[in-house]
Amino acid sequence: MSSAGVLTCIPDSGPIFRETSLRPPVPGQETNNFKPEKFTMDSQHLKHKEDFNREAEGCVAHDSRFSRWGRSLNLLLDDQDGATLFRMYLEGEGLGDLLTFWFACNGFRAMDPLEPKTSKTAKAIYRWYVQNSSAVSGRLKPTTRTQVKECVKNHQLNKTVFDQAQQEIQRAMEQEAFTSFLQSDICKEYARGVEDSPTPESPGPGLPTLTEDEEFGGLHHFSSGMGKINRAFSRIPPRNQRSHFRKLEQTYQYFAPAASINDSEISSDALTEDSMSMTDGSVDGIPPYRSKKQREIHRSVSANGKVSLPFVPRTMRPPAEMMPTSPAEFAAKLTIALEKVKKQRDAEEKLEEKLQRLKEEEEIADYDIPSSSHETVPGAALEDDPQSILDDHVSRVLKTPANLSPRSQSPFVQRKGKFQPAFSKGQTSTSCHLRPKVPQGMEATSTLASELRSSVSSQLPRSSRKPEGCTQPHRPEEGTSAAVLTTPLSPEQEAERNHSVLQWVLDSAKLMKKHHRETASVTPCPELKKATHRAASQPAHLFLQDTSMPPLTAPNTLDQLEEARRRLVEDKRVPKLHKSRCVQSTTLKEKGKTAESVPSSGFSTLKLSEEQKTAKKPSSECPGQGLAIVYYFCGERIPYMIRTKEPSLTLQEFKELLSKKGSNKYYFKKESHEFECNAVFQEVSEEDAVLPLFEEKIICKVERAC
């Protein structure tokens, strides 16, 4: 076969082969007499080909998809849009579980039966759809449900476990929902939107032709055409509409060359910066820096074009609270708000008044009950009170079994309205003095009672307060407890109290007359012991003997607990051995210097003699007792006192003795002749510094550091 024959048989039809062009010869028949026949097609075939070419170019027929959907349910579910629309339709009808179960069966069929997830998936499908879904279980046959249940329960799993159930559900969907879906509004709206949407490759209508020397009259037709386009755009989704709108804008744009603009300005004698002078190197009126600036703009847009800016609406609606209302509604709302504010302020004022009242009551209570009630009281003084001292005195002086007042066996506590002084340390010796003669009559009895009271009050410690009838409180001296301030009694209460005391004294005087005993000399100590023993044999409570004498009030439990706690703290602070030695030495001295033994109360009936005052020394001056340390903690009125065997202390050793630790400042009292008081408080901050002494004691003020 020669190539020349092939070339002669193929006509020169150009680079494109068309159906109307001559066909090449059959291979092997190139040398035969060949008559080229022109291939002709009928009009119907040509029309079909034209439709085919139009579809190949992008104009796809819109009804082809719906025709496929209408053939079978499987074709509908194979299409993504069709499955989505069908799911929406079933969910609207309350049958969404049917389609979900159908897809779950497809997914289970694709799984491997040997995998561990397969059994879990089968159980989940059975539990969620076959067992609990009424839409699925109601359309399955009982035998099918039983078969699936046994397979899942016995772990007889294979790919065909749910095939029978899937076929029954598919048959139910075809009979109940498939036909109605094709005729539903959802399907029709989707078809209408696809038909009305133009293809992406379709060009715009373009500008109408304007003939010269004629007036344009086709504006109406052009506007009607644009109306159709706008209506078509309204049915297109926003994404497609945005893309088509950009293409239409590009179609309608018209660019005039810069040269023609420049020529028109020159011909019209319009002088601008570009047309006035061309010596700056610009071409056609475009400045040379314009291109560089344009490139920079494009770079910035490409770099920052995806920055999301906040959406700011053009119109901002005011909130509902800002909307204008009628004066009546506004007045009602304002009244309610003001009433709430007024109630709140009234409640705050009442609360402030209550707090102020409580504060005043606390201040009054602090004034009535000072902190001196917690002062250390010796053990001997805790067993007696002024009334017991008076009873002992009368029994010794009158030598009669007088009716005794009740004695307080509890620790000393402070009671309002009762005569109870606070006792101090250092006075433990007593002596016997001459007894006065007993007067006659009521006036003499009252005189005797007043003398007894004055004698008892003179022998009490300096720290004891006066009876409640006095107006001026007793000032405590150095080394004694503070005075206890109480409110005075009313005149009726004072008169009743005096009457009870006088009646009791008269009864004692009558008993004395019956015994006919003379009182002329000083009673020796053995006789005093007998008298006290005889007095102690009487009942402790006066109301058992004399109903006219009112009983004492019960002691306060809180005060007793506070005193016990304070004593425990003091016992822990001071070494027990040192304390016992000091007490023992004091008792030995008193026994050696006093010829008469004293009762356990430790108080005398009359004034101490000058010899005993000089012979007895305070317990603080006993030799070998150590150094006394007195300190005030953070502004407290009552000081704390501890003792140590060391002759001197440093600041570090002093801090170890304190029960309260923390960041504090320490000021120690020392002698100084720079001031009139000859004393000054000096701050000591160094740990190794030796503490100064004042009157053979260490006196310190402990303050909180700021």
UniProtKB/Swiss-Prot annotation:
Domain RGS: 72-191
GO BP terms: cell development; negative regulation of canonical Wnt signaling pathway; positive regulation of proteasomal ubiquitin-dependent protein catabolic process; regulation of centromeric sister chromatid cohesion; regulation of Wnt signaling pathway; Wnt signaling pathway
Assigned keywords, A-Z: Cytoplasm, Cytoplasmic vesicle, Developmental protein, Wnt signaling pathway
CDD domains with a match to the protein in the record: RGS_Axin
Gene Ontology MF, one: protein kinase binding
Subunit structure: Interacts with dvl2/dsh via DIX domains in both proteins. Forms a complex with ctnnb1/beta-catenin and gsk3b. Also forms heterodimers with mouse Axin1.
Function: Regulates the wnt signaling pathway by interacting with dvl2/dsh, which displaces gsk3b from the axnr-gsk3b complex and thus prevents degradation of ctnnb1/beta-catenin.
Name under which the protein is recorded: Axin-related protein
